Each structure stands twice: as structure tokens, then as C-alpha cells.
């Protein structure tokens, strides 16, 4: 399989997002990289499903709560930016204060 660097990055984010999803299902609190991967993967999948940028910006704030991440993680992540592929092209999605 011959993937571009961008495709490799997307695959890595998606895989890390799956690991984070499984840990959440077991009740394990997510660390910084897991939190970023979980939210990023969900945003990328939402884009592929045809959701709008505005919808994803709001959706990104509903994915995780403070109780689901390790102490101090919400303060470490003031925003997340993901370059996602939408049906009409690639766009940048920015989620401010992703963990309420």
C-alpha cells in the first residue's frame, strides 16, 4: 500500500482515536494525545459524513467532558484544528474549548 504523508497522518489519527475510544469504553481517563486523537478522528469522520464546518465546530465541544480526561488536560487544549476532507473539498475545522 503506497500512502501519501497526508494519508499516513490521517490513518495514524484514526488509529489513535480508536485506541482512545476503547479506553473510554473501559472507563479509563484519556491523556493529552488520546484526547486530541479522539476529537480529531470524530471531526474527520463527521466531515466525511457530510456535516458542515459550523456543525462540527459545535460537535467537537460535546465529545468529551472533564470527567473523561486526566486532570489538567482541558486547560492544555484551548483549541483543536483539524484539516478534514468534506464532500466539496478540504477545510480547516477549529474547535474552541473542546472540553467543557
From Swiss-Prot:
Q: What processes in GO biological process is this protein linked to?
A: urea catabolic process
Q: Which reaction does it catalyse?
A: urea + 2 H2O + H(+) = hydrogencarbonate + 2 NH4(+)
* Molecular functions per Gene Ontology: nickel cation binding; urease activity
Q: Does the keyword Hydrolase apply?
A: yes
User: What is the predominant subcellular site recorded for this chain?
Assistant: cytoplasm
Q: What class of enzyme is it?
A: hydrolase
Q: Which CDD domains match?
A: Urease_gamma
Q: Determine if Transport is one of this entry's keywords.
A: no
Localization, UniProt: Cytoplasm
Alphabetized InterPro entries for the sequence: Urease_gamma, Urease_gamma/gamma-beta_su, Urease_gamma_sf, Urease_subunit
Q: What is its EC number?
A: 3.5.1.5
Q: Which UniProt keywords are present, listed alphabetically?
A: Cytoplasm, Hydrolase
NCBIfam families attached to this UniProt entry: PRK13241.1 (NF009712), urease_gam (TIGR00193)
* Family per record: Belongs to the urease gamma subunit family.
HAMAP family under this entry? Answer: Urease_gamma
Q: What is this protein called?
A: Urease subunit gamma
Q: Which organism is it from?
A: Pseudomonas fluorescens (strain SBW25)
